[in-house]
Amino acid sequence: MSPPVAGAASSGDGPPGRPPRELYTIPASSGWFQWDEIHETERRALPEFFGGAGGSGFGTASRNPRIYREYRDYIISRYREDTSRRLTFTEVRKALVGDVTLLRKLFAFLDSSGLINFSASPSRPEAQQQQRQTEAEAVVEAPVGLQVTPRPPPSYFAEEKGGGGNENGFRLPPLTSYSDVFGEWAPGMAPICGLCGMECRDGNAQILKDGFKVCSKCYANNDNKGEANIHPGDKKERIDNHSSSAWTDAETLLLLEGVLKHGDDWDLIAQHVRTKNKSECIARLIQLPFGEHMLGTVNGKLDNRLHKIQTTDGKVNKSTVKESSSQPTETVDDMQIDGNEDGADKSVEEHPTKHRRLFSSIDITVSLMEQLAHLTTSTSPDVVAAAADAAIKALGNENPQARRAFQLSEKEYQTRAFSSNHARQSDDVGGGDRDVEMHGHPDKKQGKMFISTTYQVRAAVATSIGVAAARAKMLADQEEREMELLMASIIETQLKKIQYKIKHFEELELIMDQEYATLQQMKSSLVDEWQKVLKRAFETGVPISRDEVLIKLFQNKPNL
């Protein structure tokens, strides 16, 4: 490479048999460049084409020294077609195929080294840079069809008279937010004026035709306050002083007291508070951290009171309780309570806001023996008798004295039967509840009766447990039988499917046999026709063709 020279390209003197060489100006720092070799500077600047950062080895099929030289030579040759014009990456990219990132990196390396765009006009880069800056800047202008006008001064609203300038009587102040004007009113805050954006602290608010609220001061300053501008249904809204004030401790205590007394009857709660309306009471209770929990506790107390009244009052009619194993909820209907109750108990008749289970499947007021009797009625008498015998035998094996508690002579049986009948007749004649007083029985006899009663209770409990176990065993056996039945049906269905498949395969096999027989017939007919054709050919004196060998082979081939 010739040393750098100043000025434009010139023609050099060469041998008489060679064409004149063209000289191109490059910076002195790029004197290492040679067309036939790849310098170490290029390897360090672009290690992707040389198999790593060290420059040793080869890359992939699209990244190797040969591809690099083709890219480099093309870019430099393209620039030297016209050295006065600045070469751009877009022009080079249209003719090269490869990784855009590597091509841009190679182009930047050649440009910074001065191998391209060194002799181009210096004014071109500045113009392009200025053009790029112009394109990057955002143009702020009004959309098509929209005319931007300056905002009138504040005195415009005071000086404007009549209905010509302000048709709707509503203009937003400069710093009014959307939530202040169009947002919902929050508890504890006064309404926001739509003109000045301030709170209406005086307690008066006017509703315009558009539905916005304005304070009394803005409404007085605004001349457009005729009957046509005011909403026909809401000409004036009087807001109490308590709406703009925050909740005090006394009001909160009254609210909690009203909730405890009236439950979820918000009309009565608002009357109890007196200074707040229904919506404010609801919002305040929701804002309290324990509001929902307190409301749930109140509903629970009402349910407990209902349960207590239903179980303890002697004049309560029996309620209809629908019990089902598949439906855990129960309803209590036709409940009538006699007696004088306060006004708070009237709210009990109302249905709660949520479905609650008022009673369990077994009432706690029912005696143990009644519960055991209820359990034993769910099975057959034979099972109950067997369970009772087993329980008595188990107690007898545990303690020999337990057998005496279940031994009853014929005389004692008749005595107890007579006493029970006599007591029943006396109850029918006298009526009412009578207290039975036990006199004259020694303590020893009472102790024996207590022991026998204890063993009887244990026997009853064991009987109920045995009945429950027997019922569970019966249910388990029933489920097992159902499972066996389902399994048998599944096996039968699978066997039917297999039989259908076997039948289908047999039909397919029969069809294949028929097709095979048809093919054999066609094969034999073709052989016969070929033989006839050859025979006729021999008779007419036609020379034997080479197909005769194939026919003989075909004839000698055994049938499949």
From Swiss-Prot:
Q: Which residues form the SWIRM domain?
A: 24-127
Q: Does the keyword Transcription regulation apply?
A: yes
Q: Which CDD domains match?
A: SANT (cd00167)
**PROSITE patterns hit by this protein:** SANT, SWIRM
Low complexity compositional bias: what residue ranges? 1-13
Q: Which SUPFAM superfamilies match?
A: Homeodomain-like
Where composition is biased (Polar residues), the residues are 311-330
Where found in the cell? Nucleus
Source organism superkingdom = Eukaryota
What UniProt keywords apply to this chain's record, in alphabetical order? Answer: Chromatin regulator, DNA-binding, Nucleus, Transcription, Transcription regulation
Ranges for the region named Disordered are: 1-22, 311-352, 414-445
Its BP terms in the Gene Ontology are: chromatin organization
**What sequence ranges are listed for the domain SANT?**
242-293
Q: Name one GO cellular component term.
A: nucleus
Q: Where is the composition biased (Acidic residues)?
A: 331-342
Q: Which GO terms describe its molecular function?
A: DNA binding
Q: Identify the stretch annotated as signal peptide in this record.
A: none
Annotated Basic and acidic residues bias: 343-352, 424-445
State whether it acts alone or in a complex, and with which partners, per the record: Interacts with LFR.
Q: What does this protein do?
A: Component of a multiprotein complex equivalent of the SWI/SNF complex, an ATP-dependent chromatin-remodeling complex, which is required for the positive and negative regulation of gene expression of a large number of genes. It changes chromatin structure by altering DNA-histone contacts within a nucleosome, leading eventually to a change in nucleosome position, thus facilitating or repressing binding of gene-specific transcription factors.
The protein's name in its UniProt record: SWI/SNF complex subunit SWI3A homolog
